[in-house]
């Protein structure tokens, strides 16, 4: 479309496939006030996060199209594909112009967003074709959103929150399935007998789950502050459970999986599995430490039954980060790694210095399960991987 391709490629999903033409929507986790990506007349605000839409030909192994499909949003981290073929792009940054007089807290002290013109911290819906009409889905909450996964049978959307020390795991029950802007109920998970889910978990130990209502989903800040924990604090006050730094979220075969990047005994991350029918929750993987695979982030379920896990490493190890797999039996294995010998330049970046330390993100499969698409977050590019896959769980 003539616009520069943004950097910081993060969450991504396949929203359509017709024959060999696969359409993907890709997030860009940018957070600078200035000129929005794409057409400024179609942007939500004056920050530079958003999405691009890619069309890839699997028969030819070639990229056919690349265009901006959402602009003017803040720190678009992950999201999720809806059952009706759109992409939900989630803002991980929370901001309100009405609170500009209060001092920023935490990471926001270092972000260049003080001149942002709009409210941020919401979910936006992006169509497979054209450019999104940038309307926040306020009923889904104003918080540090990460990922979304749908139970297509019920229409319920499940969401993770990437905040610390207080993060929630949420579900949104839409008033009208398929029409999220019609509103609905936002609820936060309560693990019975476990108000703190950040540590002390055992592999395979099942926990009963309940849900508490969030009275005011649009209250993104703790009262009188710019601390972006207003929604989580409402849930905690009603008895919900506290998680930390929740990341990826995936739904398949009636169950849901989600990750915590820094939870667990080693504060290096874990993966949970949830049964919404039985209302049970249990841990299926826990990182053994920051010298091992750590910081589990974006996830997707392979059509062959294995969970694909992107690494956002928590240590200073300079070897390339990995994409891993988890079998239904709980066996963990590494699938691929950023090549530490990677060289050359891309968009002004020395890849040997930039890409090697980058996280993986955006894992998603083509509808036929033959192609796996992944992003290398920095400097921001997408790879397409094909099989043969038949001999393994991925």
Predicted regions and their residues:
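Sequence/structural signature of beta-propeller domains
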Residues: 1-394
């Amino acid at each position: 479309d003539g616009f520069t391709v943004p950097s910081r490629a993060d969450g991504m999903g396949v929203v359509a496939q017709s024959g060999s033409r696969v359409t993907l929507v890709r997030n860009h986790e940018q957070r600078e006030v200035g000129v929005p990506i794409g057409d400024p007349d179609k942007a939500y605000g004056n920050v530079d996060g958003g999405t691009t839409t890619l069309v890839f030909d699997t028969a030819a192994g070639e990229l056919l199209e690349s265009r901006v499909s959402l602009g003017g949003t803040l720190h678009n981290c992950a999201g999720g594909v809806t059952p009706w073929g759109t992409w939900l792009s989630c803002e991980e940054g929370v901001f309100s112009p009405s609170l500009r007089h209060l001092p920023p807290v935490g990471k926001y002290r270092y972000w260049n967003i003080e001149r942002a013109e709009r409210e941020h911290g919401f979910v936006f819906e992006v169509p497979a074709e054209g450019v999104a009409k940038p309307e926040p889905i306020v009923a889904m909450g104003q918080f540090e959103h990460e990922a979304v996964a749908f139970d297509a049978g019920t229409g319920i959307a499940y969401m993770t929150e990437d905040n610390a020390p207080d993060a929630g795991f949420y579900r949104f029950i839409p008033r009208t399935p398929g029409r999220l802007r019609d509103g609905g109920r936002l609820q936060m998970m309560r693990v019975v007998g476990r108000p703190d889910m950040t540590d002390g978990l055992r592999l395979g130990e099942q926990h009963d789950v309940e849900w508490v209502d969030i009275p005011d989903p649009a209250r993104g800040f703790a009262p009188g502050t710019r601390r972006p924990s207003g929604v989580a604090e409402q849930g905690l006050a009603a008895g919900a459970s506290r998680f930390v730094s929740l990341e990826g979220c995936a739904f398949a075969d009636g169950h849901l999986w989600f990750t915590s990047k820094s939870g667990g005994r080693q504060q290096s991350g874990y993966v949970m599995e949830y049964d919404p029918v039985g209302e049970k929750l249990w841990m299926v993987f826990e990182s053994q430490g920051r010298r091992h695979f750590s910081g589990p982030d974006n996830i997707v379920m392979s059509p062959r039954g294995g969970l694909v896990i992107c690494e956002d490493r928590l240590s200073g190890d300079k070897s390339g980060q990995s994409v891993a797999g988890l079998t239904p039996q709980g066996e963990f294995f590494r699938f691929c790694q950023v090549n530490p010998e990677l060289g050359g330049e891309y968009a002004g970046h020395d890849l040997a210095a930039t890409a090697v330390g980058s996280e993986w993100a955006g894992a998603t499969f083509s509808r036929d399960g033959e192609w796996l698409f992944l992003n290398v977050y920095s400097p921001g590019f997408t790879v397409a991987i094909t099989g043969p896959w038949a001999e393994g769980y991925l």
